[in-house]
Amino acid sequence: MRYITHIIAVIFIMLAHSASAQSGGVVGVAYYDVDALYDTIPSRFYNDKNYTPKGKYKWDSQRYRQKVEHIAQVIDSLHMPIVALYGVENEAVVRDITAIVGEDYAYIHRTQDFSLGLDFALLYYGDVFFPEEVTSHHNALCIDGYIGDCPVTIIINNNSSSLGVLLNRNEYKVEDRAIIVLGKQRAESTSRWQLSDVMSEAEATGRGTVVYYDRWQMRHRIATNIRNIEQCNVYIKEWLLDMEGRPKPTFRGSKYYGGYSTSLPIYIYFDKLLDFSTKKL
């Protein structure tokens, strides 16, 4: 089974187009679940004691720094003007990431009301995306802004019910604008809002973002009403995988592997002159 998994991963690499090449008329957006990137300082508001120097994972400054460098490496490799992250503990972690990436990213971060203490962040080029309003909700973050002259709503989501609440709350905004939903969601929960699950084609060919019982699963998805999509896929590089062809994690169980994440990033390219549905959602 390990051999089969590795072969699938090799095929995966061959099929996935590089997400690093980007022309002037195309915009790329990526999503990455960084898998519990905590700092080393104990929190007073939630239980993160496992991710402290004396905790279960012996999460010291060296391990923390290596993880930050790994995430920055992935972001640099993606070379995307907009990158959504889930799984960062706080704004200080986001600052540490943006301080060492090769590109000059601005960022948006909001503290989430979540028992694990893990937040969302949006990294973006300030000359590509122009945010105007940020709405935070339990397990979701909504950023309204512009790409060029086109109004765009980006929702980073970790729960399908949160997505529905946000879209209902902001119903007056979602007419005549491009909508991009990134993260964990069910296809049926986005289709009711006339958003297309653009990861379904990759999923049908056996690709996914995580390996579960030796099978790829598309645990993270992208849904949108944008029509002129150039490319949408799972981002994979050989160095993101372990010897068995699975995403190389920081931990597997309590054993330290010093990897990147249990998940692979996903991405979408679309024409900068956005073509999107004008139907009321």
Task: List each model region and its residues.
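N-terminal, active-site-proximal structural segment of metallo-dependent hydrolase catalytic domains
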Residues: 19-100, 104, 273-281
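Second-shell loop/turn segments in exported
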Residues: 55-62, 79-85, 109-110, 159, ...
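Beta-strand-turn-beta hairpins that frame and shape the catalytic cleft
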Residues: 22-29, 38-41, 127-130, 138-158, ...
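Active-site beta-strand/loop signature of hydrolases that rely on acidic residues for catalysis
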Residues: 29-34, 71-94, 155-158, 162-192, ...
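Structured beta-strand-rich core segments of catalytic domains in phosphoester-bond hydrolases
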Residues: 88-157
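Extracellular/periplasmic catalytic domains that process cell-envelope and extracellular macromolecules
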Residues: 22-25, 76, 100-102, 114-116, ...
